[in-house]
Curated annotation (Swiss-Prot):
The keyword Lipid metabolism does not apply. Belongs to the cytochrome P450 family. It is a multi-pass membrane protein. Its cofactor is heme. This is Cytochrome P450 Tp4149. It holds the Pfam family p450. One of its GO terms (biological process) is terpenoid biosynthetic process. It is found in: Membrane.
Amino acid sequence: MANILSLETLLISWLSSFILMFFILKWVSFYSKTKKNLPPSPQKLPIIGNFHQLGPNPHRSLQALSEKHGPIMLLHLGSVPMLVASNSEVAQEIMKTHDVSFASRPNSPILNILLYGCKDIAFAPSGEYWRQLKSIIVSNLLSSTQVKSFKNVREKEIGHMIGVIGESYGSSVDMSALLVSLAENVICTVALGRKFDGLKLTSLLRRYLSMFNLFSVGSYIPWLSWVDQLSGLTGRATKVVKEFDEFLEVIIEDHANAKINGGKDFIDMLLNAQQDQTTGFAFQRDTIKAVIFDIFGGGIDSVSTSIDWVMSELVKHPNVMKKLQKEVTEISQGRSMVAEEDLEKMQYLKAVIKESWRLHPPVPLLIPRKSTNDVKLMGYDIQAGTQVMVNVWQIGRDPTLWDEPNEFRPERFSKGSVNYSGLNFEWLPFGVGRRACPGTQFGAAVIELAIANIVYKFDLALPNGVKHEDLDMSEKYGITVHRKNPLLVTASPRF
């Protein structure tokens, strides 16, 4: 009996100590938070935090929240603190003033599966590995010289697309689908050395890319990560990566054994960099595959979506279309196709693309960054480990920066003061600083040449007598924000 009483006393003592410690820790946590000057936060719910306030179009929902809480907000997505920047001033503080502190990326169980433990360039955490890999990619794959070297690929695939559009005369053509095929063909050829026709690769690519659109519970509520297993998300991601890995392994092995000839592609360049002993940076095939995944994931959607929105705006604004056609026609001087060398002279073309990117940035919420240390940001205390999203869609429509911000007016860029390099914080569709997209120049080369040739060769209209002002511009959120419905047009040869 004495032993039982002793055990009960011990248990009561432990329980009392635990409860006391719990309340002490809660008090310390509360006191610590009250001493910090945190950014304004919308009311959150237990477990899910502010997820219920994001809706199907988070960039628009966050704009509405910022109108109430201000240009810098602290949300909680599950257990993840997420800072949201909604104007150019806050964006500049994050991506310039405190760029080093916000140069890392958050970790994610699903991204670890899709990108070999985030060994790619887009999602790798900041550090020596990321710096070395970025240097290799920028100097070997995406330099101006290399971008120019793929001119023949761009011309060939755009010429093929123009032929398909021409054959559609008398019926409507699905411009959106054509542009996805164009982007796939260009990027496959540049990355892998050849175009892989057939439904198998197309299906594999689209299944892989679709994984980035799916919500991973474990990424935001770690103790509920079993939900990803139960829902099949983890299994699906593992399966599609295994299929893609097997496909890429064959291609890489063929390159390594010189079975594929016909010029240097991205895999050749990465294999050469892997064998280069002078860099002092050793990496395995998983890195090569992760980089190729990046190129597919970041390139196909952003290129096709960018062109799709430009063509939509041109069809909706025939006066802009005519002005652009005039410029392209005068500079091309009767040639059968627009030459890439002439693109630099087409300043209105560049203005049209910039204006479309202002209204329709491919990624309206830049890939989240993560703070590596405590930061004092515009008077607020930001703790290490806080994730950061920049709403570039909202910045592009800020009425304090842009006159009539919802109107499509390319003339606002006619002076050429804003370039693709991302140094203007009122216009940053591809980010700025250490984490700016390194492939902007590569993508722009495809986008400019494709648009110039489409408007040079064809007059476009909406089918079935639909008026241009009635074109549906609804959007759908995904890897990129693309058209909700495909762009269907009729194309008439101009000459």
